[in-house]
Amino acid sequence: MLKIVILLSAVVCALGGTVPEGLLPQLDGRIVGGSATTISSFPWQISLQRSGSHSCGGSIYSANIIVTAAHCLQSVSASVLQVRAGSTYWSSGGVVAKVSSFKNHEGYNANTMVNDIAVIRLSSSLSFSSSIKAISLATYNPANGASAAVSGWGTQSSGSSSIPSQLQYVNVNIVSQSQCASSTYGYGSQIRNTMICAAASGKDACQGDSGGPLVSGGVLVGVVSWGYGCAYSNYPGVYADVAVLRSWVVSTANSI
């Protein structure tokens, strides 16, 4: 998630906003501690691209609606955005759809990262197949310690500037909001009620995975948001809590 590996000034410039000191939104990169996979295993995964380059991840909510992170859509116009779906590779294959419009959560705050969620409407509808499928939104949070998976084309380590061509995934375990904010971990009061965490030793999402899916029990439970470094000890990855933000996603998808 947002990792501490790029100069803060560069990130602020790229994203057009500010973030807490040491807590950086994930830019281009790769899953840490994970494995290569294929899109058929994560058919809801998309690559959100700016001017043809991978920028963030996202999840297919319906044939023409994508769920991603609000910080992925700061200071950008829909005209330079596109989505690649149905491909294991962010740079080729599958189908490419232009972005018609998008909306960030009105309560999104780039300083605290609360409400870090957004909805994208595509210019054309996706045709569902074995490699393009929608994923349901969680209606409640999984139990602390529940198994989950996060996927994306994010960096393999903190500070890496290389982007893998093939989709990566990693298995992690849910860390509840209360547990993530406890003294067990290092975030404290930075964990808010619109966030959920996930962690596993030496495993995490990293720059470039932002906006992508955290899936548990076959439903979307989180949207990759931020964190301290990539797979740093005592700092789980932090995600927008889909169960908490579900009603906003549903209403926005119907109105955007």
From Swiss-Prot:
A molecular function (GO) term: serine-type endopeptidase activity
Site (Required for specificity): 204
Catalytic activity: Preferential cleavage: Arg-|-Xaa, Lys-|-Xaa
Primary residence: secreted
SUPFAM superfamilies reported in the protein's UniProt record: Trypsin-like serine proteases (SSF50494)
Alphabetical list of CDD domains matching this protein: Tryp_SPc
Cellular compartment(s): Secreted, Extracellular space
Annotated keywords: Disulfide bond, Hydrolase, Protease, Secreted, Serine protease, Signal, Zymogen
Listed Pfam families: Trypsin
An example Gene Ontology biological process: proteolysis
Superkingdom classification of source: Eukaryota
EC number: 3.4.21.4
UniProt KW Secreted keyword: yes
Domain spans labelled Peptidase S1: 31-254
Broad EC category: hydrolase
Disulfide bond sites: 56-72, 180-197, 206-230
Propeptide positions: 23-30
Keyword Glycosyltransferase found: no
Tissues where this protein is expressed: Synthesized in the midgut of both larvae and adults, primarily in the ventriculus and gastric caeca.
Residue positions of the active site: 71, 116, 210
InterPro entries: Peptidase_S1 (IPR050430), Peptidase_S1_PA (IPR009003), Peptidase_S1_PA_chymotrypsin (IPR043504), Peptidase_S1A (IPR001314), Trypsin_dom (IPR001254), TRYPSIN_HIS (IPR018114), TRYPSIN_SER (IPR033116)
Signal sequence coordinates: 1-22
GO cellular component, one term: extracellular region
Record-linked PANTHER family: AT26814P-RELATED, POLYSERASE-RELATED
Family: Belongs to the peptidase S1 family.
Protein name per its UniProtKB record: Trypsin alpha
Gene name of the record: alphaTry
